[in-house]
A protein has these predicted regions:
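Transmembrane helices of ABC transporter permease
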Residues: 39-52, 181-232, 303-316, 333
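ABC-type nucleotide-binding domain
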Residues: 374-624
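A short amphipathic helical element positioned immediately N-terminal to and/or at the very start
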Residues: 22-37, 161
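Helix-loop-helix
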Residues: 196-210, 280, 284-353, 358-359
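Juxtamembrane helix-loop junctions of ABC transporter transmembrane domains
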Residues: 14-22, 45-46, 53-69, 107-158, ...
């Protein structure tokens, strides 16, 4: 195969603060509303006006009843309409005329119309703010995730991350779109309603407010319990999503081992656990809201009883009693809304804490404050005393004392038994990991002194399992150079032996490859990956067993393409089939993380040792 061509991150910790309401994440979340401040202010103003109009409704209705039965005079809110449109004094019951009632009814209609207008403004502007904040948060979180190191994703299930991008942010959206404005509007309704109630009858108002302390205590107790259950449910749902993601991404393995029932049982168990938490949350919610409203219904019952006695004594006009009852319902609704807002803040605080855990995660590959610029890259890669181990594997060194130089344009083959450290070694080249000890340099510059994006611009990787994205063939080829012309894309495909099969598709380069490139064969995907690397034009190549899973015909086509790709580039080749590396400039033999042999194919065979053992194992049948 590889014949020489001619001339930031530690994982975030678990959710904390489940025992008390921590508003810090929610306050941080509100910072994302700044770009939409004027829309939020407009929604707040509209909501406040709407709340005042809603308070006006009981007053107008009370005036309507008082005037209809001649039990009282008109208030200032409706008096102007009666003066303007009403009838002559002395007509009707108690001096009230049908025209007076018509005038008050017009005020009632105007209140309804204005309230509808303010509701439209509030709902539309809040929808814009909520969708905008969520879109900004998703974009920021996704960009941040893409900048984290490989180690972060090796310690976090993909499903858990996806859950935080979707369900947690959906919970946040509901809070952003509702909590702040509802807090203001319900405050206006509550304070304004209580003031009007005191104006109507202070003694009756005190009776209504007598039940408030018990309601507030109940809300606090239920809210604390709801927060704990909501946090547990979100964690369990993320775990279920992680299991589903794992099974779906490995569907071929699942089906080949007929493990469908096993995976379904695992997912079902995770869903049952989440479902149990969801039922606990539903049960607490079911107790939460009725308990709060029961207190207010008791207050309304007391108002009816005591207000009826005042009306019988002539101390309270019947219209004022109706106004009082309607305002009591309004105040009760406002306090009930506060309890609902409290539970929503609980859930949003838990969801935002989980999202901000990801946003606060830092890569364990810090970028230099003043990176060294890479000008004309020659491609010399040097490993100096490199030792490396994964954090979750105890004290086992995966690489132990590696000293190796790959000269510009040289093809270096890495061979050895499974677990020898071959793949780990090449992951240090694009700086997916940093060595624990020693250093890796490019043209004499420590990789830790380079901008990672600048470094990776000069490194091309063709893995064994090629990942294509679910776009067109052309989009996948130009993935490393989005601004490449169509002619450059075709030229890269021709050099990669891909142009012929691409043109056989009805849509040519516009053919959609499907998720992960499933519509293409393994050899076709590999050649598209080679075309992608050719178009990127890197100085350094990493070929990680690039043909080990291909049939002979596909391997021959890919081999020719790889030889073109390697021309003039420093290349690291990993291969289990030793026949594919016989023409490499140097073969480096690894065993247990150490270099045990270095040389060309013929030299290593003559020398004996591990290389010849591996060679004889692979070719004993042929030699026989």
């Amino acid at each position: 195969m590889f014949r020489r061509p001619s001339a930031r991150s530690a994982p975030a910790g678990p959710s904390e603060g489940a025992g008390r309401l921590d508003l810090a994440p929610f306050r941080r979340l509100l910072g994302y509303t700044r770009p939409y401040a004027w829309r939020l202010v407009l929604a707040l103003v509209a909501s406040s006006i709407g709340s005042l109009l809603f308070l006006a409704f009981p007053v107008v209705v009370g005036d309507l009843f008082n005037n209809a039965f001649g039990a009282g005079s008109t208030r200032a809110l409706t008096g102007w309409a009666v003066d303007l449109f009403g009838g002559s004094a002395g007509e009707g019951i108690g001096g009230t005329t049908p025209a007076d009632l018509n005038a008050i009814a017009l005020v009632l209609i105007a209140v309804f119309a204005l309230n509808a207008a303010t509701t439209y403004v509030r709902v539309y502007q809040l929808g814009h703010v909520g969708e905008g904040v969520v879109a900004d948060l998703r974009r920021e979180l996704f960009r941040h995730l893409l900048g984290l190191s490989t180690r972060f994703f090796e310690t976090r299930p993909t499903g858990e991350i996806t859950s935080r991008l979707t369900s947690d942010i959906a919970t946040i959206q509901a809070a952003v779109s509702n909590v702040l404005v509802q807090l203001v509007s319900q405050s206006v309704s509550l304070v304004g309603g209580v003031v009007v109630l005191f104006v109507i009858n202070a003694r009756l108002t005190l009776v209504m407010l007598a039940v408030l302390p018990a309601v507030i205590v109940a809300a606090a107790v239920f809210g604390r319990r709801l927060r704990k259950i909501s946090t547990a449910f979100q964690d369990e749902l993320a775990a279920a999503n992680a299991r589903a993601e794992e099974a779906i991404s490995g569907i071929r393995v699942v089906q080949s081992f007929t493990a469908e029932r096993h995976e379904a049982d695992r997912y079902g168990e995770a869903i049952r656990t989440a479902f149990a938490s969801a039922l606990r949350r539903a049960r607490v919610r079911a107790l939460f809201v009725p308990s709060v409203f029961t207190g207010f219904l008791m207050g309304i019952g007391l108002v009816l009883w005591y207000g009826g006695r005042l009306a019988l004594a002539g101390d309270l006009p019947p219209g004022d009693l109706i106004t009082f009852l309607l305002l009591t319902v309004t105040v009760a609704g406002s306090i009930g809304a506060f309890t609902g807002l409290y539970s929503q803040v609980q859930e949003a605080a838990g969801a935002s804490r989980r999202v901000f855990e990801l946003l606060d995660a830092r890569s364990d590959l810090p970028e230099p404050a003043r990176p060294t610029a890479l000008d004309a890259v020659r491609g010399e890669v040097r490993f100096e005393g490199v030792r490396f181990r994964y954090g979750d594997r105890g004290d086992a060194w995966v690489l132990d004392g590696i000293d190796l130089v790959a000269n510009p344009g040289e093809v270096v083959a890495l061979v050895g038994p499974s677990g020898a450290g071959k793949s780990t070694l090449v992951t240090l080249v694009p700086r997916f990991f940093d060595p624990v000890e020693g250093r890796v340099t490019l043209d004499g510059v420590d990789l830790r002194e380079l901008d990672p994006h600048d470094l990776r611009h000069h490194v091309g990787v063709v893995p064994q399992e090629t990942l294509l994205f679910s776009g067109s063939i052309a989009e996948n080829v130009r993935y490393g150079r989005p601004n490449a012309s169509d002619e450059e894309v075709v030229a890269a495909a021709v050099a990669a032996n891909a142009d012929a099969f691409v043109r056989e598709f009805p849509d040519g380069y516009g053919t959609l490859v499907g998720e992960r490139g499933v519509k293409l064969s393994g050899g076709q995907r590999q050649r598209i990956a080679i075309a992608r690397a050719l178009l990127k034009d890197p100085r350094i190549l990493v070929l990680d067993e690039a043909t080990s899973s291909l049939d002979s015909e596909s391997e021959a086509l890919v081999q020719v393409a790889l030889e073109r790709l390697m021309e003039g580039r420093t290349t690291f080749v990993i291969a289990h089939r030793l026949s594919t590396v016989v023409d490499a400039d140097r073969i480096v033999v690894l065993d247990a993380g150490r270099i045990v042999q270095v040389g060309r194919h013929a030299e290593l065979l003559a020398e004996g040792g591990l290389y010849r053992d591996l060679y004889e194992i692979q070719f004993r049948d042929v030699d026989a």
